[in-house]
Amino acid sequence: MARSRGPSGCVLIPPSDLPQELPAASVAAASYGRAIANMSSVSADSLAERSKRGYVSAARTDQASKTRSRVIHAATRLFVEQGYATTTMRAIAGEAGVSLPTVELLFGTKPQLLHVVLDVAIAGDDDPVPVLSRAWAAEAQSKDDAVGFLSAVAQVLKEAQVRSAGVMLAAYEAAASDPDIDLLIADRELQRQRTASWIVDGILKHASLRAGLDRAAAVDTVWMLMDPVVFSRLTRHRGWSLERYAAWFADSIAQLLVAGR
């Protein structure tokens, strides 16, 4: 069919010659636009759902943490007041206001629960940060001399003794008839030795040991002075205040270990 030209010279295409379907590129563009719109809708829904799930998960985590804390506090009190051997997991669950299966799910066996109780009592919280990697240790090491270092350590030790000495005494009592607790006590004694070693090394950054005293003997001396039994006898049986205990600890180590004291 002949096609006429318009005034500007452009070829005029009759309507019958126009394509009845959009080119493939146009169809693809339209489909892509619809897909993007759908994706936006789905993405918004997914984000909302994920946000909701995250909120629920955070709430559950917080609740689990509070439950764990209640059980630890309940176990600590009962172990100290009633003794380890006579305190049952069921009694701990009742004291914490939770079910026995909940306690067993969170902690496993009674020896495992005692292990956690001691960790929390010594550190002061349930955070999985080693005691000697905490801020107080770095602060103590920043002191200008051995006396300042020992004074800072003694302040932290007295608080740890307040929290943990009673539980340790209950564990000592149970260890004689319970192999699991005996192993736990051995581990605690080793940890105390590591802390004593750290204290001696802290002293050596500022001063020398007394003549005739080697590092191993110095560590043993500090290890003994840190004994929770000693703390208990001085504060409970002899009526010492916590400040008197802390001052005695720091001064005793300085006099027994540091040259020139």
Regions found by a protein language model. Name each.
Residues 1-66, 133:
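N-terminal intrinsically disordered/low-complexity leader segments
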Residues 70, 74, 78-112, 116:
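Helix-turn-helix
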Residues 84, 107, 173-178, 228:
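Short helix-capping/turn signature of helix-turn-helix
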Residues 106, 116-117, 199, 248:
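Residues in the recognition helix of alpha-helical DNA-binding motifs
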Residues 110-112, 116, 127-162, 219:
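Hydrophobic alpha-helical connector segments
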Residues 120-125:
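Short, basic, alpha-helical segments at the C-terminal edge of helix-turn-helix-like DNA-binding modules
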Residues 152-172, 179-207, 216-220, 247, ...:
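Amphipathic alpha-helical packing segments from all-alpha helical-bundle domains
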